């Protein structure tokens, strides 16, 4: 599955927040990206198809594929 730019923004945000705080929830992404919680929910539902997982406490984790994509985006934006 290919990601659009907005999907890339979400996986990068998850990576950044995880590195900073050690855990990520949808509300954290909404605050970080300054978007609505329903927008995050929609993106998360799409990204669950290969890029992230959600545990029973609603914490978000990047899959190995998600981490690879997020790291590439993060490095590209740092340049």
PLM segments and residue spans:
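Generic detection of well-ordered alpha-helical segments
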Residues: 8, 75-79
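Alpha-helical residues within the helix-turn-helix
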Residues: 31, 48-49
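Short hydrophobic beta-strand motif reused across regulatory alpha/beta modules
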Residues: 52-53
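Basic, amphipathic "hinge/linker" alpha-helix immediately C-terminal to the N-terminal HTH DNA-binding motif
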Residues: 58-76
